[in-house]
Amino acid sequence: MTSNLIYPYPTLIPGVLRQRYKRFFADIELASGEIITAHCPNTGPMTGVCTIGSPVYISPSDNPKRKLAYTWEMIQVNNTWVGINTAIPNKVIKYALENQWFAQLKERYTTVRSEVPYGKDNKSRVDFLLTQNEGKSPIYVEVKNTTLCQGEIALFPDTVTSRGQKHLRELMALLPDTKPIMLYFINRGDCYSFAPGDEFDPTYGTLLREAVKKGLEVLPCRFEVTPEGIHYLGLAEFLTKL
């Protein structure tokens, strides 16, 4: 590949964040002075990245049935664009897996399936299941969007996540017969290392370290976000302790 551009954005509209409320709504002031309400595709607290008055970009929709005509895509934090649309990481990773972008996974799979049931009574779904020739162990890949940064270190989670804890326990249950991977999608280009967010969810941090000791593979993937698109930058250093 000659370019590390992995996901081009459609034409985006600049604005300024004026308010985020009820989790799903964001008031954005456009260059004209008009204030519009955009869909906020991130239900989390967005710790450290939701600062009123910050520059943002939104995408327009041509779907007349949509209640909100715009989607909030990114926000600028300390001169770095941070992707906040949680629907994007899985799209990017699916493309990357299908096109063998990750050197760490080369020749380890031939097929990619999304949202595959697994876990106790098949009541959970893993983001991606990678398989190859019969007799080879499948690879389970769970993706976590990561936006919080402290001193060039990306942290996940940014709040208590019982769902994230559940995913770690389910991936650990697959060991040692299969090879699970936790892929952290670092949705900003200013982080060079990754660590569990113990300050925000110490239980998650404990579980992650336990899972790694048992064989869980961690891929903290760095991405640069720009209004033109998302670029893959390679892996961040995984820090088990800060």
UniProtKB/Swiss-Prot annotation:
Signal peptide start and end residues: none
Molecular function GO labels: DNA binding
Disulfide bonds: none
Pfam families assigned to the protein according to its UniProt record, in alphabetical order: SfsA, SfsA_N
HAMAP family with a match to the protein in the record: SfsA
Family designation: Belongs to the SfsA family.
PANTHER family hit by this protein: SUGAR FERMENTATION STIMULATION PROTEIN A
Descriptive protein name: Sugar fermentation stimulation protein homolog
Gene designation: sfsA
